[in-house]
Amino acid sequence: MQQDMQNGGPGNTISNLSSALRQVNLGNSNTTTDQSNISIDFNQQQLLEEANQGSINAYNAQQQQQEHLQQQAQQQQLHMQQLQQAQQQQAQQQAHQQQQQVHQVQHQHVQQDHMPIGQSQQQAMYQGPNPIDSSRITKFFQNQPMEGYTLFSHRSAPNGFKVAIVLSELNMHYNTIFLDFNLGEHRAPEFVAINPNARVPALIDHNMENLSIWESGAIILHVVNKHYKETGNPLLWSDSLADQAQINAWLFFQTSGHAPMIGQALHFRYFHSQKVKSAVDRYTDEVRRVYGVVEMALAERREALIMDLDSENAAAYSAGTTPLSQSRFFDYPVWLVGDKITVADLSFVPWNNVVDRIGINIKVEFPEVYKWTKHMMRRPAVIKALRGE
């Protein structure tokens, strides 16, 4: 109403009529003109009321039309919201159905004793309820070798290659059977009988009445202790109980912390049915923490070695006036336990070889780990084992 008064609505009509009345009313004297003014005033008042009523009616009609349009707009908006909700519910139902279909496939989870490496090999790691073709495994167990070792592994299993590296370093006679997960060979009854976890690696020691061992750490300890007992040479091992304890500590650290964390980081980065960034970040950060532990240990070994072998510059190194990186022994190999390579070191190799696939550059982030790994990767036995020979 206030807007109408400003734009020439009913209020403006009243103002114009009042001006006209003032012009007709000549004064306060009682003349005949005053009587005519009364008539004019009465007529003008009637016109004023009629004009005002017409404006009010027009205004009310306009208001009703606006309210009707607003109601139509609100109804249309409500209809659109209901349509969008229906579409969202339909999309959610479709996504839920797809997720159920995914979960109906029984994937074979990659655990600490089995982690795929190549993208083409990743699909082979997940097995649905396919029939088991155990013919090859059955044939092997019906005619086992009389001596040596049989290693059950997979082409994409770092822990299987970890055992192969130790067997190769000890120059032990062994044969590797790479299981075909697409055929379900890891679920063959004969294999489950020697490894109830139905995972790789598993080892049969044919020289000990076909003794079967499973879990990579247990296999390595069996092999290295047997070699030491038979030869008297603590190769990859130690004749010191104190050093043996330290070797065991690092070996258990690798099997319980290093390998599983990389395995989970790979799983959530590449294999999980949904992208869960928090899981990827959590396991990748944990891998970095683990490498930080190894990096610190190797750095301490490096400093001790330089101080021992580069004695003429030891004072400058201790004072900090000369950085350790200037020592000629800065790239000299150092090991986790003692002054020689052991199974504690070699157990890390296959997993260090795949860690770049979770976005960790050990050369940049962990230089001592990188140098340590590089020395081990150049060993002939390691090269042979990683080739699957």
Swiss-Prot record:
Record keywords: Nitrate assimilation
Start and end residues of each GST N-terminal domain: 147-231
One Pfam family it belongs to: GST_C
GO MF, one annotated term: transcription corepressor activity
Function summary: Plays an important role in the cellular response to the nitrogen source. URE2 gene plays a major part in the repression of GLN1 and GDH2 genes by glutamine, and is required for the inactivation of glutamine synthetase. URE2 gene product may catalytically inactivate GLN3 in response to an increase in the intracellular concentration of glutamine.
Organism field: Kluyveromyces lactis (strain ATCC 8585 / CBS 2359 / DSM 70799 / NBRC 1267 / NRRL Y-1140 / WM37) (Yeast)
Superkingdom per UniProt: Eukaryota
PANTHER family for the chain: GLUTATHIONE S-TRANSFERASE-RELATED (PTHR44051), TRANSCRIPTIONAL REGULATOR URE2 (PTHR44051:SF3)
Signal sequence region: none
Biological processes, Gene Ontology terms: nitrate assimilation; regulation of nitrogen utilization
Chain ranges of the GST C-terminal domain: 240-389
Family per similarity comment: Belongs to the GST superfamily.
InterPro entries in UniProt: Glutathione-S-Trfase_C-like (IPR010987), Glutathione-S-Trfase_C_sf (IPR036282), Glutathione_S-Trfase (IPR040079), Glutathione_S-Trfase_N (IPR004045), GST_C (IPR004046), Thioredoxin-like_sf (IPR036249), Ure2 (IPR017298)
Taxonomic lineage of the native organism: Eukaryota, Fungi, Dikarya, Ascomycota, Saccharomycotina
Subunit structure: Homodimer.
Designated name of the protein: Protein URE2
